[in-house]
Amino acid sequence: MIDDILLESEERMTSSVEHAREDLTTIRTGRANPSMFNGVVAEYYGVPTPITQMATISVPEPRMLLIKPYEQSTMDAIENAIRNSDLGVNPTNDGQVLRVTIPQLTEERRKEMVKVAKSKGEDAKIAIRNIRRKGMEQLGKIQKDGEAGEDEVRAAEKDLEKITHSYVEQVDSLVEAKEKELLEV
């Protein structure tokens, strides 16, 4: 029972760290990164579809992305979706492919993005702490119900605390890496 609680808590914490990692990849850094288009959706035969499923996205140069639609008929929809997104980029259409040049970030914009990264990291740490709190409540309940002894529960609480600490450190290192990437000129 105690092992199940610890295992479930750890799985949920892993999921929170992965979610944070995905959130942080969507933050624009001034470098070309295909994952920045993960949240961009275009109309495809009347159905909202992620553009990552409608085209191949490559990085021919450090600050340029090349988007080649699988179907030429979707070119305008993809172009409009990128233009209307909040990414702040403007694609150029040469008939075959879309070229997206990533503008250099200003110092002010970099600092804003660092704040966004820290905020996303803090959200992930809050989620991890909430998972810990729920695990602690479950441990307290099984002790109260007499399913486990006080010593077992106390040891499990220490283990849960160690697990939580390691996942919070993982989030901190992700945010630190993103911050370093953002402030690099």
UniProtKB/Swiss-Prot annotation:
UniProt keyword Endoplasmic reticulum present: no
Q: Does the keyword Membrane belong to this entry?
A: no
Where in or outside the cell?
A: Cytoplasm
| Predominant location | cytoplasm
What Gene Ontology molecular-function terms does this entry list? ribosomal large subunit binding
Q: Which UniProt keywords apply?
A: Cytoplasm, Protein biosynthesis
One Pfam family linked to the record:
RRF
Q: Which GO terms describe its cellular component?
A: cytoplasm
GO BP terms: namely:
translational termination
Note the InterPro entries from the entry: Ribosome_recyc_fac, Ribosome_recyc_fac_dom, RRF_sf
Function text: Responsible for the release of ribosomes from messenger RNA at the termination of protein biosynthesis. May increase the efficiency of translation by recycling ribosomes from one round of translation to another.
Instruction: Give the similarity note.
Output: Belongs to the RRF family.
Q: What is this protein called?
A: Ribosome-recycling factor
Can you name the source organism? Corynebacterium jeikeium (strain K411)
- Lineage of source species: Bacteria, Bacillati, Actinomycetota, Actinomycetes, Mycobacteriales
Q: Which gene encodes it?
A: frr
